Amino acid sequence: ASFBZAPPGBVKAGEKIFKTKCAQCHTVEKGAGHKQGPNLNGLFGRQSGTTAGYSYSAANKNMAVQWGENTLYDYLLNPKKYIPGTKMVFPGLKKPQDRADLIAYLKZATA
């Protein structure tokens, strides 16, 4: 199913998901450094593997995906299937609601 069919996202619920499942490896604040994963500030509309100062896998750079609601929705279901060879160890979020919530939060937090 695509993002168009996803339930409406809840920013607060998405923030909780980010804090429990993503924040150990990612930051969202402008100017915050990279951790295990890249800072996600300015994520929407950016091409995969292009954040300055972060060492990406060749897979991430070569995928050249444009991050947006649809691509993130698919990616977050199963990152390793979406970008084979990615360094991201996160197994993904199976529930459409969780993905919609996280995307709603990221849209706000990374803008």
Curated annotation (Swiss-Prot):
The modification N-acetylalanine is found at residue 1. The modification N6,N6,N6-trimethyllysine is found at residues 80, 94. It is found in: Mitochondrion intermembrane space. Heme c binds at residues 22, 25-26, 88. One of its GO terms (molecular function) is heme binding. GO terms for cellular component: mitochondrial intermembrane space. The keyword Aminoacyl-tRNA synthetase does not apply. InterPro entries: Cyt_c-like_dom, Cyt_c-like_dom_sf, Cyt_c_1A/1B. SUPFAM superfamilies: Cytochrome c. The keyword Phosphoprotein does not apply. Its main location: mitochondrion. The modification 4-hydroxyproline is found at residue 79. Binds 1 heme c group covalently per subunit. Keywords: Acetylation, Electron transport, Heme, Hydroxylation, Iron, Metal-binding, Methylation, Mitochondrion, Respiratory chain, Transport. Electron carrier protein. The oxidized form of the cytochrome c heme group can accept an electron from the heme group of the cytochrome c1 subunit of cytochrome reductase. Cytochrome c then transfers this electron to the cytochrome oxidase complex, the final protein carrier in the mitochondrial electron-transport chain. Belongs to the cytochrome c family. This is Cytochrome c. It comes from Ricinus communis.
